[in-house]
């Protein structure tokens, strides 16, 4: 059986081409002024999953730019871990002392998003979004330190979109192993299981995470979120379902081809 190739969106392709240049970020009038301050915090010297922390931040921001997100959401992508978070110990700005500095370079709206994204539980956020726990207006209640914190529909939409871009930029089979069952990760004794976390592992594509990103994407169809931000142009603009079984099957088929010893041509 021969499957048709997915049609290429000419407008999407035209937007993506300039972003392949190494210097694209320095030419972006909304993001370029922030870049020197971020780079001065040595983000290019920190390892992060499949590259450096700088590589990751720029990659997330590139995706958000292709998706035509507004300035504050793109800046959230560029700065999404600079206050640190539960996943990575990479504090580039002290949230207790340097919020004013980040507000100065990024603006109040973007800094507010960055601070919330770094200090609220992203695990709890993903769990609740995937569990369809959004309120009727699209807001979401998170618990922190025994108290409820309500994210507005705009914050929820921004966090979903940035979470999608953040995850797809970095996730491969190594994360499947060390963050098994994310967002419901179970603690494992490091001494007993250290070999499973050897980087980079077999470098397979993820066998489960695209399905989870699809779940986040479909949440953007909630009536309270649907028109809040530009809809990412993935999964048929976040309307198409991808089952876990289909993702696993596609990954297995892809990997079986990759591991063949001979190229798929006549010798």
Regions found by a protein language model. Give the residues of each.
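Short amphipathic alpha-helical segments that mediate assembly, nucleic-acid/protein binding
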Residues: 10-13, 31, 155, 209, ...
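Amphipathic alpha-helical repeat scaffolds of TPR domains
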Residues: 245-263, 267
């Amino acid at each position: 059986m021969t499957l048709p190739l997915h049609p290429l969106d000419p407008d999407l392709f035209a937007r993506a081409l300039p972003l392949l240049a190494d210097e694209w970020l320095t030419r972006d009038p909304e993001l370029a002024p922030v870049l020197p301050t971020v780079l001065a915090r040595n983000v290019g010297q920190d390892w992060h999953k499949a590259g450096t922390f700088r590589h990751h931040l720029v990659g997330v921001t590139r995706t958000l730019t292709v998706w035509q997100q507004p300035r504050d959401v793109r800046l959230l992508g560029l700065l999404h871990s600079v206050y640190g978070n539960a996943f990575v110990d990479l504090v580039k700005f002290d949230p207790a002392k340097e919020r004013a500095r980040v507000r100065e370079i990024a603006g109040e709206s973007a800094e507010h998003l960055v601070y919330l994204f770094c200090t609220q539980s992203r695990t709890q956020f993903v769990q609740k979004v995937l569990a369809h726990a959004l309120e009727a207006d699209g807001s979401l209640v998170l618990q922190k330190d025994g108290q409820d914190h309500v994210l507005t529909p705009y914050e929820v939409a921004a966090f979903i979109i940035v979470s999608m871009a953040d995850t797809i930029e970095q996730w491969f089979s190594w994360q499947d192993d060390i963050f098994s069952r994310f967002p419901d990760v179970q603690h494992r004794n490091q001494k007993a299981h250290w070999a499973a976390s050897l980087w980079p592992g077999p470098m397979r594509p993820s066998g489960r995470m695209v399905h989870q990103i699809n779940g986040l994407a479909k949440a953007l169809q909630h009536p309270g979120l649907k028109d809040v931000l530009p809809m990412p142009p993935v999964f048929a603009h976040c309307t198409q379902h991808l089952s876990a079984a289909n993702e696993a099957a596609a990954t297995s088929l892809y990997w079986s081809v990759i591991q063949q010893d001979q190229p798929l041509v006549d010798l």
